[in-house]
Amino acid sequence: AIRDVYKRQLRDRAYKDNEMARSALLNVMVQAAMKAGRSLARDFGEVQNLQVSLKGPGDYVSQADRRAEQIIYTELSRARPDYGFLMEESGEVESKDGQHRWLIDPLDGTTNFLHGIPVFAVSIALERQGQIVAGVIYNPAMDELYTAERGGGAFLNDRRLRVASRNKLVDSVIGTGIPHLGRGHHGHYLVELRNVMAETAGIRRMGAVALDLAYVAGGRLDGFWEDGMHPWDLGAGILMIREAGGFVSDKNGGQDIFGTKTIVAGNEIIQKALLKTINKPI
């Protein structure tokens, strides 16, 4: 117990030190993400209790999602009242300044959360004139805070992030998302999955795309691809990977990631190889 208290003290001191190094804008985002994350962590404990109840946790999780989104909306609106919003739960709020828009996923990994699996995150990104300029991904279960600003690098807590340096697909572990009932073209995905399985060291499916992208930025995953994504899923993670020295494109090799709802990411070599592999003819 004493060791846990000491670790928390060190962590809190590191966060305070980092607050001094971050921009005022990023600090606002961090505070909003961590406040929402603490709310989710409390709710997650209750979800685990509801797993064994007759009612089940479904309604409670929906409330937790909305609570987290409201916390973020309140915090960011207070700090930057002229900025717009694009939120997973509440949709779009037009900006007053015509330039800035927050992209918010208050609970990425909802299904994991619902089933008591501690793999979920809060994701916040800021668009300025259509370009992502700042991003925060917070994993409450592991108390991992990922941050990035355009031109300022990407960080996990106080550690600078770099994408993995592997240069062969055969040595790489690749993340993906698997389409479920009523979503995505399963036949096309199975072809892509078969191709990637045949050329890599392994495939991981975390169920929280924001964390997948953060893991690519930090070198835990060598690459990632998925279809059917939304701006709030991808915004923060795209910036983190680029600021960590990685490459990101849509499945056509272009930059219309939000338009195509597709993403392929990794270091320069792995990203190109993964792009080629998933696009192999049937």
Model regions and ranges:
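Short, small-residue-biased leader/transition segments that mark boundaries at the very start
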Residues: A1-Y6
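Small-residue (primarily alanine) positions within well-ordered alpha-helices
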Residues: M29, A33-A36, G135, A154, ...
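Residue-level signal for inorganic ion chemistry
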Residues: L40, D65, L76, T110, ...
